[in-house]
Amino acid sequence: LEMFSATPELVLFGGQIQEWDPSFTRCFGRRTVPTSHPQILEFAQSRNPFNGPSVAFQRVRVLSLGGYPLVGANEDYALWASIMASGHVTANHAEDLVFMRGGEDLVARRSTQRYRRGEEEALKFIYRTGLWSFSRFALHWLTKQLIRRLPDSWNRYIYRNLRQTIPAQVPLIYEKAHSAWNTFQL
């Protein structure tokens, strides 16, 4: 929240994340996103430039844009696109702000027909914001439709390789919380 006080024009701020198995014993990887606004705008042409669980935004400014769009999937990405296309300043912190549980079931959820339809709605919304050209939209649509139809094992491989592999190092805050919880349960 210090960033919003120090930079009043900042509307959206996020950071890096690490994804872990449910027991926090195996790290799936780190999703790294760009930190500066120009880098974020460039990255947004190919991938989501924010890690949703790490994001904070100025509510009043987001509501002035209409709030979260009513799309069937990727609502966060559609909102970020609306913010960026409106010319608002965005940034990401270079450090890991979230250590989250992830899992292989994410791939299966993203392979459903319902998810594909929702994702298509989100892609159309992002195109309508003006963030993407039609050719960029078409490339995203085609790529995502093809990937979502691949076998889950192929999608898991693709998903894993989009994450930066890092050594498994349980976050200190988790160790403290886990220790406190075990003490409480006794």
Q: Across the structure, where does each feature detected by a protein language model lie?
A:
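Conserved nucleotide-sugar donor-binding catalytic segment
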Residues: 15, 21-23, 27-113
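Acidic/proline-rich low-complexity IDRs
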Residues: 9-11, 64, 185
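A short, conserved acidic/glycine-rich loop-to-beta-strand motif
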Residues: 7-17
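C-terminal subregions of glycosyltransferases and related glycan-biosynthesis enzymes
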Residues: 72-73, 78, 85-186
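Short alpha-helix within the catalytic core of nucleotide-sugar-dependent glycosyltransferases
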Residues: 1-6
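Generic N-terminal initiation segments characterized by hydrophobic and/or small/turn-forming residues
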Residues: 7-9, 25, 183
